[in-house]
Amino acid sequence: MMRIDKYLAEMGQGTRSEIKKLIRSGRVMVDGETVKKPELKIDETTQKVSLDGKQIGYAKKEYYMLHKPAGVISATKDDRDKTVLDLITDKKRNDLFPVGRLDKDTEGLLLITNDGELAHRLLSPKKHVDKVYYAKVQGKVDESDVKAFADGVDIGDDTPAKSADLRILKSGEESEIELTITEGRFHQVKRMFAVLGAKVTKLARVSFAGINLDPALKPGEYRKLT
């Protein structure tokens, strides 16, 4: 059981004070009957709530797979730039957040949820969760780079980057690679290649914690996960 004003607030219908005004003005119905008491307790799993005639379903947890496009930031809100949450147009809850972050100019798989426990498990350094990236690199990548990445590249932090699995997809003036890392340091992939004298020109995350980006999703598109 939960208060009707809390229910509507969690579903992103406004602040608690705004919602109390909506309820008292008779714009909220529960099971087809108008309610005017914000403190009214309802069963969020069985009762139907509507605001201005529109049904507001309840979701305790939400999970989305987003194909983050370049130019969008991995944040919940920002005064200047569009955020990944701005792209989730049919979300129910107002407490969603991205699990980790991708750089502004990086695209690819990003999980969006309000499940803090899951996020902690996936982001904990102790878990060594695989993150797989596809990249285009300016410059030739060869087997010596594969070995260097496996040994751990010193990118200027207190400790070198952990062993990473570099797979060469195409080698030439512009190379294409797939890289699996288990850390999430600041600009890590770009810094690792920079140490080897190469520049990343395109970067996309294709897998995270065993979840692969749905190839049907274009940049900016998303789908719910169950």
Q: Which positions does each model-derived feature cover?
A:
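Basic, flexible Lys/Arg- and Gly-enriched helix-loop patches that mediate nucleic-acid binding at interfaces
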Residues: 2-225
